[in-house]
Every structure is written in C-alpha cells, then in structure tokens.
Amino acid sequence: MEGPAFSKPLKDKINPWGPLIVLGILIRAGVSVQHDSPHQVFNVTWRVTNLMTGQTANATSLLGTMTDAFPKLYFDLCDLIGDDWDETGLGCRTPGGRKRARTFDFYVCPGHTVPTGCGGPREGYCGKWGCETTGQAYWKPSSSWDLISLKRRNTPQNQGPCYDSSAVSSDIKGATPGGRCNPLVLEFTDAGKKASWDGPKVWGLRLYRSTGTDPVTRFSLTRQVLNIGPRVPIGPNPVITDQLPPSRPVQIMLPRPPQPPPPGAASIVPETAPPSQQPGTGDRLLNLVDGAYQALNLTSPDKTQECWLCLVAGPPYYEGVAVLGTYSNHTSAPANCSVASQHKLTLSEVTGQGLCVGAVPKTHQALCNTTQKTSDGSYYLAAPAGTIWACNTGLTPCLSTTVLDLTTDYCVLVELWPKVTYHSPGYVYGQFERKTKYKREPVSLTLALLLGGLTMGGIAAGVGTGTTALVATKQFEQLQAAIHTDLGALEKSVSALEKSLTSLSEVVLQNRRGLDLLFLKEGGLCAALKEECCFYADHTGVVRDSMAKLRERLNQRQKLFESGQGWFEGLFNRSPWFTTLISTIMGPLIILLLILLFGPCILNRLVQFVKDRISVVQALVLTQQYHQLKSIDPEEVESRE
C-alpha cells in the first residue's frame, strides 16, 4: 500500500463487514453430484498456486467426502513470494532475503468478490484498510465469515534453516531443502467447510512495512475431485451395447506340472493375461443367479435338490435385512470406501431390526434395535464385511461422522440381497400346466428370507463344520462380486437415464432390467413365470438352458401322468379327433337312448290317462238322459195301510 495515502491501521479500525470470500474450484468428471450420497468418498486434491510465477506452493491429496475433506495446508511464505518480489529488491533468492522476510507481518485480502475501493490484482485486492480478512499482523486481521485463515507456524529463530541444504556445505547447522524458514499454515474455517466451491478463488497477500509500498503477491486455491465416476456419452443409446449372450462355461483344465527348461535355453517370460472385460447382460445376470445358488446350496442343501430361482422384472431389485454388527473407526477413509463401492441407489425394502446411526425419524425407528450415537470428531465408520450402510441418501460402505453431525442423514446397517425368489418345482410346473389352482397366491420365498442374518455374529450360523461363517466362504464372495457388478450396471443405467438427451423412445428403452430379462427369455435362457425370469437349479448347479429343461420336465410329468391312466382315458389322450367326435354326438345319442328306454312306459301311461278321462265323460253324458226315482220305505207303506 502507499504510505502517504492513508495511515497505518489500528486494531479498532478493522471493518468487520468485509466481502464474503468463496474459495476453491471443484473439478468434476462430467457427472452431476446433486443426487450423490453425502458419504461418498472421493480423491480430493487441494492446490495452492503462486499466480506471479505459476509454481505450485502446495498440493495435498486425501480420500474424503465433500463435507470433511478440508485438511490443513502447509507451505512456505517464499513459495508465494518467489525469488524477486516487485521492484523493491525483496525476495527469497538469498538466505538473507529469506531471513528478512521473517521480520515482516503480512495480511491477506480476497479477490473473488471485491468490494468497492479494494482495488484489483495490482493492489492485491487490498486497496484500503478493512479489505483484509486474515494474516499475521499486530492488529490480528480476522473475520467471522471468512473461509480460510492463513497464519505463521513456529518460525525458527536461527538463520540456519534459511540456507538451502542442497546448495551449501554440510557445516551450516539446520540448513533445510530450499531454505524454508517461513512456514505457514492454511486452515479452513467452519464457514469455509460449508461453502459452495464453484470456481477458482484468488487472494492477494501483502507484506506490512512501516514505510514505503507494501509489496504484493497473489495466490489461488483450487480443489480437484477425481474418480467421481465414468463419463456418460451424449448420443445413441448406450444400454443395448452390452447385451451380449452368456459365454459358454469354461472347462477347468488341471494344471500341468512345470517342465524344466532344456539346458542352454533362454528363460521365457510368461505372457500377461489380457485385462478382464466387463460381463455382458447374460453373464452378469447368470452370475447373480449362480451366486445366489452357491450361497443357498452351502447353507441349505435340502432346498437345492431341485428348485427354480427367479429374477424379478420390476423394482425393487434388491432388499436389505437390518442386522447388528461391530463397525470399525478410521481417522482417514479406508481403501474399501472408494468411489467404486459407492452407490446412489435407494434401498426401498428393508426388514428386521439392526444397528442405526444418525437422526432416525419416527417413521423408521422400527428398523432400529440399537441407535448408536457418534462421538465428537471427524472419522469414518466402516461397515463390517458382508454388510453395507443403507442411508436415506443411498448405499455406502463408510459413513462420515462430519456429514452425520452437519445433516439429518441416518443409516441402518444391512445385508444386501438380490431380489431372487425361490420356487418349488411343483409350483412352477403347475403354473405352466395350468392344472393346479390356488385359492390364494403362495407366499414367495426370497433370498433375503432364506439367508438373511447369516453373515453377522449371534445369528451367524456356522457352515460346514460349524466354525466357518458364511461371510468367509468363497460362495459368499462370489455372490458379493456379482451383486457389486449388477449394482454398477443398474447405477450406470440410472445415470444414463438422467443424462439422456435423446428421444422419448430411447428413454423408454433404458428400462434396463426389463430389457435384460426379455433378452434372456427370448434366448431361451430362462422361463418366464408371470413377472419373473426363472432358472432351473439342482445339485449340479444352475442350468443355463432353462427353457429346454422346463420342456423336458413338463414332458416327463406328462408321461408319468399318462402312465397312471387307464386304457379308456389313454384313448382320449392319444386321439384328439376322437375326443372331439364323441363330445359332438354324445348329447344326441343320450337323448335318443332315453327316448327308447322311457318312451313306451310314458306312452302307456298317457294312453291310460286319456281312456280314464274319456270313460268319465261318457258316464256324465248318459246320466243326463234319466231322472232318479224317489225311493219308498216298505215299513212306511205298511203303516199307512
């Protein structure tokens, strides 16, 4: 600043109503985050750049959420000054210059929103007193709304650290790489952690000198967020591309014993395996059914003697079982909290009672057996193996306590099971034969009802010898891998639907699961039962050609039914035309037979009835011609005489 223009500031002259600073840049990979889970973990990089030289003063990367990834940033004042600072001759080119920089106070002014009178880049946005919001000076510049604070750390008193250890002899005590003897620390305030980082932000920094012009430098702070997810192309529908038929089962070849190389032969470097490709529609859904079968066969072999496992065509495609478990605390995000394991899908069906975290509303407290209160601090709660946190914002393997403290988010620890229904063979065959009628629809058994609670302690039943939990088996790992693959495909379809800029027909085509199951049904891989796509399974595994298996079983049942019939019933079954002929002439024949049997008797009775009526009529006619004589009593005649 120009000394004659105005006097040096006093502590009570600082204007507390300075401009609001918004700092940082959020670099996203082309995907909107408005629907992402607040617990989603990203690779966040904060970068402090000297705008005068273009050099990076600090680049700090960490795994964290958008709510708690605000670390302390450490760098040196000379990283912001450079070798030469303005035309004053100050700078950090020499140890003396670096030592002299320790004697000056400094103050910082925001450059993103510059109030009237604070100047521009040339003035470092500090054109007048009251524009500064932080720094290290005797009047202690600060603000209650600023997003950062920039202060000195413990500054060494001796001159040794100001010498560059790579450019001087080893007899200089305390020499440091680059001669760093002006350490600074940048911290985010509460306002900064709640702010919206929507672009690169710049500050001006000036050294406070009692006389003359205060030298100026500028620096920026940016935030980069990497691995947020795959880019979604704008163009033709991306859903149909991976609807590939299932691959043939690979025959397992027994490994051959290694043969010793011939003498004098050069060693052969084995070829690396090609990178694995994402499974197509057929393989992905068959892997899901096969994983469900493997887990069911391991825990309940009696249920897999012969059964049908069906995928539902309509949502929900997954259901959760609330469980009690012991989560682990981590001060930093563990590896399993990566973006690949985050899902913004909502779990609409949760049963049971389990462990809850956060502010659970009354409408969902029935799912909570225990509600855990989080302690103060910023750390991560990692779900135990085989489970996941089902939150009102999506599915996540890890929770950020910072998010829970700042929001009304709540989560339940659940086991995640695909919506695979279990049907007995009799029910399926009866539906296709249409011979069995039910007064009410039988209750559908799902994988969650059959296996729910088997991965956690207490309810965790032993498998095999009774000492191995289901979560530790290869069968369960196979099911979990299939679940994550299918969830990724569903989420990709949802994202494509959200970003679709094409016609309505393409939007309708992106009913992903319905398309997938239709694809399998048309290929004969599954049997369509109402709203389900069913696969046949027995102790040999899941049959891929389920329609052929269904036809085979129906033919066997038909032959067994025919073998139990008599020759007369078999005659009708073997001659369809005879059945039609008999049903056509049977009515008239029965009527004719009844006439022949009962006709004469009825006719005789009718004739006799007619004769009786005629005789009565004749008698009446004859009596009309005569008069009845009065009868005389003989005794009365004698008495008269």
Curated annotation (Swiss-Prot):
A motif (CX6CC) lies at residues 526-534. SUPFAM superfamilies: ENV polyprotein, receptor-binding domain, Virus ectodomain. Residues 471-520, 530-566 form a coiled coil. The keyword tRNA processing does not apply. Residues 256-281 are annotated as: Disordered. Residues 603-641 are cytoplasmic. InterPro entries: FMuLV_rcpt-bd, TLV/ENV_coat_polyprotein. Keywords: Cell membrane, Cleavage on pair of basic residues, Coiled coil, Disulfide bond, Glycoprotein, Lipoprotein, Membrane, Metal-binding, Palmitate, Signal, Transmembrane, Transmembrane helix, Viral envelope protein, Virion, Zinc. Residues 1-32 form the signal peptide. Residues 33-581 are extracellular. GO terms for molecular function: metal ion binding. The chain crosses the membrane at residues 582-602. The record marks R440, E441 as: Cleavage. Glycans are attached at N43, N58, N297, N336, N369. The mature envelope protein (Env) consists of a trimer of SU-TM heterodimers attached by a labile interchain disulfide bond. The YXXL motif is involved in determining the exact site of viral release at the surface of infected mononuclear cells and promotes endocytosis. This is MLV-related proviral Env polyprotein. It comes from Mus musculus (Mouse). The lineage of its organism: Eukaryota, Metazoa, Chordata, Craniata, Vertebrata.
